[in-house]
Amino acid sequence: MTSKLKLFIAVWFSCFLLSPALSARNKFKTDTVTLISFNDFHGYFVQDGVAPGASALVQSVLDEKATSPHAFVVSAGDNFSGSFFSKITKGEPLSDMFRLMGVTVSAVGNHEFDWGKEYLQTNSKPDMTYIASNIEAEEDCGKSWLPAYKILSCTLKNGAPFRIAFIGLTTVETQYKTSAENVVGLRFEHPYAAAAIQLAYHLKKEGKIDMVVLLCHLGTDMETPACFQECNTKMLPYMEGVDAIITGHSHRVVLDKINGVPIIQAGSYGRYIGKLQFKISPIRKSEAFRVEYIGGDTIKTDRGKRHVEMEQLVDKYRKKYSFDEILTRAEDDLLRSGRTYSTMGGLVTASYVEYFKKNMPADSCSLPLIGVNHAGGIRNDLYKGTINRLEAANILPFAGQVVAFRFTGKMLKKLLDDGWNNPNGRLQACHLTVHMDGNSVRAVEYVTGGESRIIEDEEECIVVLDDYITDGGDQYDSSLFVRPVLSFNEKNFVTTDAFIDYLKSKPVIHRSDVPVPNIIRTE
């Protein structure tokens, strides 16, 4: 062998050994990436009988992050609207909560629109990005809409970047799951088609993408064979190129795998944390990586944990707004239900009737007065014991307007019939006996002062309710609400105020005193 050839081989071999990239790749066998998620927090910053609170959630997430060097924390939507605390503070502590957990991306939930699309686009201040690939703005909407996806990255053991594309998807139910005025100028497109477009076209412009995650505010559960509840979402796990799906909306605890794709949902109100882990392996003679799902968990948030800074922020607002003021005492549990008329539904709707009486002349109250509320607007239960202002307000956290309309008996029957058969839950009511033939309302009796009488088809009555369903929310018939009681409606009374006022007027509440409708079925 010539000296020149020996020198060439020595130089070549030393370069090979000293090459950082090749040396690192030789040493690097596998790495792990973790996705930590939560969903449907709904602004439940304060710990109560329902939620562990923001302080416990933050600390629990940070503890999970500490065990995973490459952890990404994301939200599947419905972050700020849904608690009275959040309504009053306009979600003010959310930016701090996201900052402390390191959340930088979220799906758009239907309740993200409760304060208007302008708030979502410009006034929400979390240091993060809302993504929605299946929401498109009409030309006259006035602003470009939110991005369809966001790419996050970390550095693996070998020094190479690992890039994850999160594609946002939102339930098309948003069109009737928030007030119609809040989504004017927006179209909610088919989720599968929207995600497929991002995968097939737009992500290709972003260079090498190592992993794709669908970050969805779409309902899932463990009882449905396809896992996804909405018909237009059931094929999402079969979309080529998708590595994981993180979901929300249905408030269920879900950990499933369809077509080899892990699907997770972490309950609601911060009660659970979702965790998916993936083994990352280099593909020989390639810059690409093999992504393999190696396990997941839905971890119950530890209510005993506290993050000091988050706790101090929440306490500041509790004191400012007197959230701990005691209003009354419940001698029994007062529970809601979407399947039948409930104690909580009767209590809420009775408060509307009493508020109407309190604020209107006596001659305006001579007609039968019936309170109603859509099932989805009653968000919580009250349990035996003292009830403070925040606990009461969290029953009606959206704080809509309480309004009144003139109805005939025939219109009332239609409203109650529609409400009994509404797929979003039974319409709640008070001061009634409802005669049912199967699932159809045959007749309605008005019950007051220990007496009852049939409300005839042509007889006038007044329905007092929250304004959400009056413009078609939850798929109710807006044509029923054509004769407003303007002298009441123009005062812009708030549902939550009416309910709190009602509770304060009662030193003690017994379940037996709540005017829950009675049902009489035809044999």
Task: Set out the residue ranges of the language-model regions.
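Low-complexity, intrinsically disordered or weakly predicted helical/coil tracts enriched
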Residues: 10, 225-226, 440, 447
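Residue-level detector of intrinsically disordered, flexible termini
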Residues: 9, 20-23, 70, 243, ...
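Residue-level detector of intrinsically disordered/flexible regions characterized by low predicted structural confidence
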Residues: 6-8, 259, 281, 520
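Acidic, metal/ion-coordinating pockets
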Residues: 25-298, 343-355, 362-371, 402-406, ...
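Bacterial Sec-dependent N-terminal signal peptides
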Residues: 1-27
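Catalytic centers of hydrolytic enzymes
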Residues: 28-34, 44-46, 58-66, 100, ...
